[in-house]
C-alpha cells in the first residue's frame, strides 16, 4: 500500500471531536437506527403543540380576567349617575369639552363608555372645572377634542406636569432656606417675591449673577443700545441692571441694540440733526473735518469755490 494512502487511513481511524459529535446522527453498520432515534416522533410533536396551545389559552384567560377586573374597579370608583350628569349637563364646561372634533371610529362606542374615556372625564372634571387655565386641563381638552393620543401617553404627560407644579411649589417655599443659608455668609440679604437678593457694594444681586466689581462711573456707564467694551474686550450692555455680554443676548435683542432707534433721541437732538443737515445742504457748512482725511480733486475745487464765495458773500464761519 502506498505511503499516502496509509496516512489517509490512519487519519480516518483517529477520533476527532467533530466525528464524535456526529456519531449518533447518521446510520452506521454498528447502529443502523441512529437517525430514527434522534429525530422526534409524531407523538412528541403532537404533545409539544398541545402544551403550546394550553399555555396560550391560559395567557388569554389571564388577560381577559385582568381587563374585566380593571373595568369593574373603574366603574365602581366612578358612579354611573355622575357620568350621566356630566354627559347631559348643559353647562358651559361640558359643552366646551364634549362632542367637539372628530370622534374615533374604532374605539368610541356611543352606547357604552370605554374605561379610558371615563378616566379622562374624571380627570377633566377634577382639573378643568376647578381652573380652566390649568395646563393639565388644557391638555385634557386637547385630547378630548381630537383624541389623537393614547390615554397612557396623556397620563404620563399629566404626571410630568404635576411634578413640574410640585417642583415650582417646592422652589417657592425654599426661599426661606436660601435666606438662612445666605445670612451665614455675613452679607445683607433681602427676600423678594420669587428669589433672594444679596447686597454687594451698593447694589442688590441675585445669587449667581454677580460678575465681579465693575463700577458704574459716568464715563463707564454703557450706552443702553450699542454697549461698551470691558477689560476683556467683550462688548456688554446693561439688562435690568446687570452686566450682560452682547454675544450672550438673543438674536432679536442684538438686532434691536444694533443702533439706537430714531424714537430714542430727544426732540432737541432731532432738531439739531435736522439743522446740521439743513446747514450742510443750503450753506455748505459743517463736516469740514472729513477734508483732512479724504482729499479729492472735486473736494478741493469745491473748497476753493466755497472759500472765494464766502469772502464775497460772507456765508462762512471763517470770518
Swiss-Prot record:
Biased segments, Basic and acidic residues type: 28-39
Superkingdom classification of source: Viruses
Cytoplasmic side: 1-44
Pfam annotation, one family: MMTV_SAg
Region (Disordered) location: 1-39
Residue intervals annotated with topology Extracellular: 66-319
Residues passing through the membrane, by range: 45-65
Subcellular location: Membrane
Record keywords, A-Z: Glycoprotein, Membrane, Signal-anchor, Superantigen, Transmembrane, Transmembrane helix
Xref: InterPro entries: MMTV_SAg (IPR001213)
Membrane topology: Single-pass type II membrane protein
This protein's record includes keyword Glycoprotein: yes
Cellular component terms per the entry's GO annotation: membrane
Main location, first listed in the record: membrane
Entry-listed glycosylation sites: 79, 89, 93, 131, 146
Protein family per UniProt: Belongs to the mouse mammary tumor virus PR73 superantigen family.
Other facts noted in the record for this chain: This protein is coded in the long terminal repeat (LTR).
Entry function: Superantigen.
Protein name: Protein PR73
Organism: Mouse mammary tumor virus (strain C3H)
Amino acid at each position: 500500500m502506498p505511503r499516502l494512502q496509509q496516512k489517509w487511513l490512519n487519519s480516518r481511524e483517529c477520533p476527532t471531536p467533530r466525528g464524535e459529535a456526529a456519531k449518533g446522527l447518521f446510520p452506521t453498520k454498528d447502529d443502523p437506527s441512529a437517525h430514527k432515534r434522534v429525530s422526534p416522533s409524531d407523538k412528541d410533536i403532537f404533545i409539544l403543540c398541545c402544551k403550546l396551545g394550553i399555555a396560550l389559552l391560559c395567557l388569554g384567560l389571564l388577560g381577559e380576567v385582568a381587563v374585566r377586573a380593571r373595568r369593574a374597579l373603574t366603574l365602581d370608583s366612578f358612579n354611573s349617575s355622575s357620568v350621566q350628569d356630566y354627559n347631559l349637563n348643559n353647562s358651559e364646561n361640558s359643552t366646551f369639552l364634549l362632542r367637539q372634533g372628530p370622534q374615533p371610529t374604532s374605539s368610541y362606542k356611543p352606547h357604552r363608555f370605554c374605561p379610558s374615556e371615563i378616566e379622562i372625564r374624571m380627570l377633566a372634571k377634577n382639573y378643568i372645572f376647578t381652573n380652566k387655565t390649568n395646563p393639565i386641563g388644557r391638555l385634557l381638552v386637547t385630547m378630548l377634542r381630537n383624541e389623537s393620543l393614547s390615554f397612557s401617553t396623556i397620563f404620563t404627560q399629566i404626571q410630568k406636569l404635576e411634578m413640574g407644579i410640585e417642583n415650582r411649589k417646592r422652589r417657592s417655599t425654599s426661599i426661606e432656606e436660601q435666606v438662612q443659608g445666605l445670612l451665614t455668609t455675613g452679607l445683607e440679604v433681602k427676600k423678594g417675591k420669587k428669589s433672594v437678593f444679596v447686597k454687594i457694594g451698593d447694589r442688590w444681586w441675585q445669587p449667581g449673577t454677580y460678575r465681579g466689581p465693575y463700577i458704574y462711573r459716568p464715563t463707564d456707564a454703557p450706552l443702553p443700545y450699542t454697549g461698551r467694551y470691558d477689560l476683556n474686550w467683550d462688548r456688554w450692555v446693561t439688562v435690568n441692571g446687570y452686566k450682560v455680554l452682547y454675544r450672550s443676548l438673543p438674536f432679536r435683542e442684538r438686532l434691536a441694540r444694533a443702533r439706537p432707534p430714531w424714537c430714542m433721541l430727544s426732540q432737541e437732538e432731532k432738531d439739531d440733526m435736522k439743522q446740521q443737515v439743513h446747514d450742510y445742504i443750503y450753506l455748505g457748512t459743517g463736516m469740514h473735518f472729513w477734508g483732512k482725511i479724504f482729499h479729492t480733486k472735486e473736494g478741493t475745487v469745491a473748497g476753493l469755490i466755497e472759500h472765494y464765495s464766502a469772502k464775497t458773500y460772507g456765508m462762512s464761519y471763517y470770518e
